[in-house]
UniProtKB/Swiss-Prot annotation:
It comes from Shewanella sediminis (strain HAW-EB3). GO terms for biological process: protein modification process. The lineage of its organism: Bacteria, Pseudomonadati, Pseudomonadota, Gammaproteobacteria, Alteromonadales. This is Octanoyltransferase. Keywords: Acyltransferase, Cytoplasm, Transferase. The active site is at C169. Catalyzes the transfer of endogenously produced octanoic acid from octanoyl-acyl-carrier-protein onto the lipoyl domains of lipoate-dependent enzymes. Lipoyl-ACP can also act as a substrate although octanoyl-ACP is likely to be the physiological substrate. CDD domains: LipB (cd16444).
Length: 219
């Protein structure tokens, strides 16, 4: 049954806009029987500005493009060495609300890092995952027709300097950290593999079907 099956798509390195439009298309065209999916991807350097985003939080983008997008939250950075995961989930079918989905995503990251003896936690007033008040994962979702898209970004082994060109998630002086510094997963592939396990467990998926890349129908 589709309720207990999660399709996991490994997209490799893909530009942000093409993946964004693909997840919009999937969400717009899905119906009650369309399977839930989790897309795992890395993006080239890009700043994305959420719907609540204020331009003053983009300090000095330089040669990195800024894209205005339709997710919640403020500005963030994506780049090589960062695990990006997009849960395309029918939350109406799962009978959970958006707050529960956010909590499940945050807990999936916290539990994954626990496996490396890294003590991470979420904050009620600032979505994402933190270690010693430094942010290791950012979160921004959109719900349309009872289904989620956009998702999370986990810093793994990347050039962190572009975060200094913005106020990450709208917080001036927020310090970012990455898994490599913390003794967590050392590669995006390793982090993705571990996160798929904790995420699917927390959302109650019993069957995982793995795919490489996107097909025209995404199914």
């Amino acid at each position: 049954m589709s309720e207990s099956t999660l399709h996991v798509r490994y997209l490799g390195k893909q530009d942000y806009e093409s993946v964004w439009h693909a997840m919009q298309d999937y969400t717009d065209n899905r119906d009650a029987s369309s399977p839930d999916q989790l897309w795992i991807v890395e993006h080239p350097p890009v700043f994305t500005q959420g719907q609540a985003g204020k331009s003053e939080h983009i300090l000095n983008p330089g040669d990195i493009p800024v894209i205005q997008v339709d997710r919640g939250g403020q500005v963030t950075y994506h780049g090589p060495g960062q695990l990006v995961a997009y849960p395309l989930i029918n939350i109406k079918r799962l009978k959970i609300g958006v707050r529960q989905l956010v909590t499940d995503i945050e807990n999936s990251i916290v539990q994954m890092l626990e496996g490396y003896q890294v003590k991470a936690y979420a904050k009620a007033d600032a979505p994402g995952v933190y270690v010693d008040e430094r942010k290791v994962a950012s979160l921004g979702l959109r719900i349309r027709k009872g289904c989620s898209f956009h998702g999370l970004a986990l810093n793994v082994d990347m050039d962190m300097s572009p975060f200094q060109r913005i106020n990450p998630c709208g917080y001036a002086g927020l310090e970012m950290v990455q898994c490599k510094q913390l003794g967590g997963p050392q590669t995006v592939e390793e982090a993705g593999e571990r996160l798929v396990k904790t995420f699917s467990h927390n959302l109650g998926y019993q069957n995982l079907i793995h795919h490489q890349g996107l097909s025209e129908s995404y199914e």
